[in-house]
Amino acid sequence: MSHPALTQLRALRYCKEIPALEPQLLDWLLLEDSMTKRFEQQGKTVSVTMIREGFVEQNEIPEELPLLPKESRYWLREILLCADGEPWLAGRTVVPVSTLSGPELALQKLGKTPLGRYLFTSSTLTRDFIEIGRDAGLWGRRSRLRLSGKPLLLTELFLPASPLY
């Protein structure tokens, strides 16, 4: 199963450097804290609509593969993050199987819990980079994060109803 927003997320083209954008846009695109928390600060109830979750092989993650260790399998999670039931963000998380050990096994058991609720409670979370991307007038970003030094890649597409616009 797929969703048009996830297809558009995979079509994002990334800027080589941070573009000169309005401060309000950059505030959203370069946010280093939890996007879930930011959405809740808008006075909204945040929920997750699961699109796809499970193990995939390298051929299913061509966009992410250059940014992650080469492994036989990856945990893929594709969701819509909704505010009061309205989709505001499409998210795609790719986790190398080697990351899924110790406390990070919890990444496979998030279910309808927003990823940010897990990530941003960890004292071992670090971020290698944020890249800004755009496709058909919509903005997105991707970040390589690390939990206990172990990588995962998070890509987010801000949907038209999002307060970013």
UniProtKB/Swiss-Prot annotation:
Residues noted as binding substrate in the record, renumbered to the chain: 35, 77, 115, 156
Record's catalysed reaction(s): chorismate = 4-hydroxybenzoate + pyruvate
Protein EC: 4.1.3.40
Keyword field: Cytoplasm, Lyase, Pyruvate, Ubiquinone biosynthesis
A single BP term in Gene Ontology: ubiquinone biosynthetic process
Recorded metabolic or biological pathway in which this protein acts: Cofactor biosynthesis; ubiquinone biosynthesis
Coiled coil regions, renumbered to chain: none
Subcellular location: Cytoplasm
Subunit details: Monomer.
UniProt function note: Removes the pyruvyl group from chorismate, with concomitant aromatization of the ring, to provide 4-hydroxybenzoate (4HB) for the ubiquinone pathway.
Protein name: Chorismate pyruvate-lyase
Protein species of origin: Escherichia coli O157:H7
